[in-house]
């Protein structure tokens, strides 16, 4: 992995997504198929009904194509790369299935929660098996704990795929946060590029940054297209996989602090309502609470991006200093 291949990776994934996205938007508009809006959501979100979704279809395609040709050129086609591509594509397909039900059946809910959870768990199990023979290390230690860590991997990937999915409720929020998150892991990988598997991880992060940069102009407010579950599930699972393969699992709790807070707000809201009959927030995930408090989408986006950026800087700096 050198400077030229890094630049071409970002440029390739960016251009494929940026140049082809208008055609995908035009296709979905012609089909009159778009996002269905939750009835219990903010009333002003109703105007977003019909906005094309499944933008993840193109930015995942762009990332995969770019990763494969650069990896073939640089001799980086390894098990590490296949593991990352597996997570990206399979979780994307799970989301695509869910999005298709919503779009073509004109409903906001996709397939049943247990069906989605089962697919996510099975995919995470396959990822675990792929790397089982190499052994695992905890992010802040060297103790190998076998099957117990395997369960942790499944929980980590499924958990963060859903956390990013919950966060994807405002125009541009997740695409902006994800660029920051992948950039943080790119820096960690580049600093340790001599470590086995790190060049492949760097390539993966570069491609994801490029493709999301190409997607962002069409996704920020007012969004011309949403990434859909296809995009958000794939991004969340991929970030979890990257953190695992870098052996800095716990760093995702900091780098992905916004995803964690969004998920925690939902859990706390449900727990509070079930036990006391009272709600802690006006609406969850928490970005809706701020909407209901009078914040504009742009204000929420910018504040959340800044929180994500500061958290990423803290996490990366700590890892580089402490190791």
Curated annotation (Swiss-Prot):
Belongs to the glycosyltransferase 4 family. MraY subfamily. InterPro entries: Glycosyl_transferase_4, PNAcMuramoyl-5peptid_Trfase, PNAcMuramoyl-5peptid_Trfase_CS. Pathway: Cell wall biogenesis; peptidoglycan biosynthesis. The chain crosses the membrane at residues 5-25, 57-77, 81-101, 118-138, 140-160, 173-193, 196-216, 225-247, 302-322. HAMAP family: MraY. It is found in: Cell membrane. Its main location: membrane. It is a multi-pass membrane protein. NCBIfam families: mraY. GO terms for cellular component: plasma membrane. GO terms for molecular function: metal ion binding; phospho-N-acetylmuramoyl-pentapeptide-transferase activity. PANTHER family: PHOSPHO-N-ACETYLMURAMOYL-PENTAPEPTIDE-TRANSFERASE, PHOSPHO-N-ACETYLMURAMOYL-PENTAPEPTIDE-TRANSFERASE HOMOLOG. One of its GO terms (biological process) is cell wall organization. It catalyses: UDP-N-acetyl-alpha-D-muramoyl-L-alanyl-gamma-D-glutamyl-L-lysyl-D-alanyl-D-alanine + di-trans,octa-cis-undecaprenyl phosphate = Mur2Ac(oyl-L-Ala-gamma-D-Glu-L-Lys-D-Ala-D-Ala)-di-trans,octa-cis-undecaprenyl diphosphate + UMP. It comes from the Bacteria. Keywords: Cell cycle, Cell division, Cell membrane, Cell shape, Cell wall biogenesis/degradation, Magnesium, Membrane, Metal-binding, Peptidoglycan synthesis, Transferase, Transmembrane, Transmembrane helix. This is Phospho-N-acetylmuramoyl-pentapeptide-transferase. PROSITE patterns: MRAY_1, MRAY_2. Its cofactor is Mg(2+). Catalyzes the initial step of the lipid cycle reactions in the biosynthesis of the cell wall peptidoglycan: transfers peptidoglycan precursor phospho-MurNAc-pentapeptide from UDP-MurNAc-pentapeptide onto the lipid carrier undecaprenyl phosphate, yielding undecaprenyl-pyrophosphoryl-MurNAc-pentapeptide, known as lipid I. Its EC number is 2.7.8.13.
